[in-house]
């Protein structure tokens, strides 16, 4: 089986082993599967299954469209993993909660990937809100 791991174009040349999916890929290879990293959306690499792994809180539409070309793609429907998009469990001013809380950033990994890929967050937010980009 051919497994394509779809990555952001800016991940090319970076240490991919920091992503858990590449640790899993070692096991898939040992089981005889071919695992192929695919960077960006300009070159389609045929595969039986794909895993969309874009290290951003908001996945750009072009990556989701590209992922749709694969017969089966894990994470294809996951466009937004910001805390407010995935959880309603938030304490807000006036809630009257006096107990302990866990403080999380709105963005995945405290927005680190967005800072590394400067400008991507602003463009993504603008598109989601129908604004500039």
Label for each model-derived stretch:
Residues 6, 57, 67-133:
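Active-site nucleotide/adenylate-binding loops and adjacent lid/helix of ATP-dependent enzymes
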